[in-house]
Swiss-Prot record:
InterPro entries: Lipid/polyisoprenoid-bd_YceI (IPR007372), TTHA0802/YceI-like_sf (IPR036761). Belongs to the UPF0312 family. This is UPF0312 protein SAB2563. SMART domains: YceI. The lineage of its organism: Bacteria, Bacillati, Bacillota, Bacilli, Bacillales. Coiled coil: none annotated.
Amino acid sequence: MTNFTFDGAHSSLEFQIKHLMVSKVKGSFDQFDVAVEGDINDFSTLKATATIIPSSINTKNDARDNHLKSGDFFGTDEFDKITFETKSVTENKVVGDLTIKGITNEETFDVEFNGVSKNPMDGSQVTGIIVTGTINREKYGINFNQALETGGVMLGKDVKFEASAEFSISE
């Protein structure tokens, strides 16, 4: 069994969504945690739970961030966390239950395991995992949008994300 200790200082969770049909808005969640258990040498034994604090959303625009925290989007007063719990892990895919605003759907994402390395700063063994995917926000009750005069809508329904998580590991 491998012991995994999440390193939030060397991890990130970023997203992007189409805006006004012509560009993308990018942002991040600044507070999240990932708990992993299992044997790093046997992917089938790995189980993970990610917990994201939606009120930590950061798009570098306070007014937009406040709107995203409102009931139009994440409703952070009522829903204080987003979770992802794995059901299965392979070398390049992860399947699990994603819960946003109390709505749970099974999702499949791409995963990249980057092996094990020795940290030259403290001698610890570390590993990294990068998870990427696309989420249809409307499946989670995040339906806010506005029609554009030129056709189309203000916001795309698909949100692309990349989560990069680093862990100290020990046996």
